[in-house]
Amino acid sequence: MPSISKTKSGERYRAPTDQARKMDRKKENKRNKKDRQQIRQAMAKYCNLDETTSKLLALERQILGLDPQPFHIDVLRKKQKVLTDSINKRRMTLQQGKEDAELKKFNDKINAYQSDCQKLAVLAQQARLAREADPDMIPLPMGDVSTAGPERNNQLLAPAMIKRKVEFQLPPRPVRVAGQKPPGPPCGLAPNFSDSEEEEEEVHDDHYDDIDLAPVPIPEFDNPYQPIHRNYGPPSSYNSMPTRMPHHHHHHHPHASSHYNPMGFQNHHEEAVISSAPQINRSNEPAAPATLSAAPELRNLRRETVKLVPAQLLRRPGDNKTIVPRQAAPVQRRPEVQKQAKNTDEAYNDFMKELDGLI
């Protein structure tokens, strides 16, 4: 559009009426320019910052999805932009007017608004993760919750006990009267102390020594079967074995001469009496581990086997008696007494001769 200061529009000249109208409009705009600036400054100066920031926070919640959106998100962002421009104009007005106190309050409110926007962003992120998370994939705590009763909850919620500081001191001594002498040594002879006192003390040990124990006869029990005397060897060796010499004890026991009968044989010399309580032999030493040892031994399996030979081979030459069936000889266990059989060639020749006679 051509300028209003020109008298012609393109190649054609303007009409005188249009030229006059354009000049009047130019003067009016120049006259109202200051009025419009004053109106804008008044609007920016009296802008309520708290109300504007509350509106911006409401729009921020709608844009982030925390609140339902009444309009499209683009419309909400346009409204947010208009309110932000009004805040910027307010800042420019304060800067031009050099009002430092008002500008400081304005900056504090803007910082609080920005921190609230950051909190809303974090809250929106948590809500989005909560919607996308699967509750079945969250691990549950281990243990039975039902076993913990109200007492356990009270213990967890109760405050920690305050420990009092205890000072340990010696008991107070009795007050000594002025002029009273301290007590002297105890009456009587002093005890005789020596360096070898500990060596002469008797050592009390729960371990019982076998030398101090005497043989105790075992009483006869009701045995329905007669005792079996297992004496292996000739009869003359029954009484030929020397008897075991008894141990010489320092303390004489009245039943020390009784015979020890571990197999339950009948004893007709005296009645069976338990003369002392059963004793327990305790050994504090650890038992030695069992060790199995064996020397290598070579066996002659060929000599241990029993050879099966035909009956015809066992017949002597020239013996024409009728063959009498006889029982098989018992298996001989000892290989050194076993009869040496014929070798393989002789047995094979005799077997072939027998077959020729049968054919």
Curated annotation (Swiss-Prot):
Pfam families: Wbp11. Residues 1-38, 235-264, 317-341 are annotated as: Disordered. InterPro entries: WW_dom-bd_prot_11. Residues 8-27 have a biased composition (Basic and acidic residues). Residues 245-256 have a biased composition (Basic residues). GO terms for biological process: RNA processing. Activates pre-mRNA splicing. May inhibit PP1 phosphatase activity. This is WW domain-binding protein wbp-11.
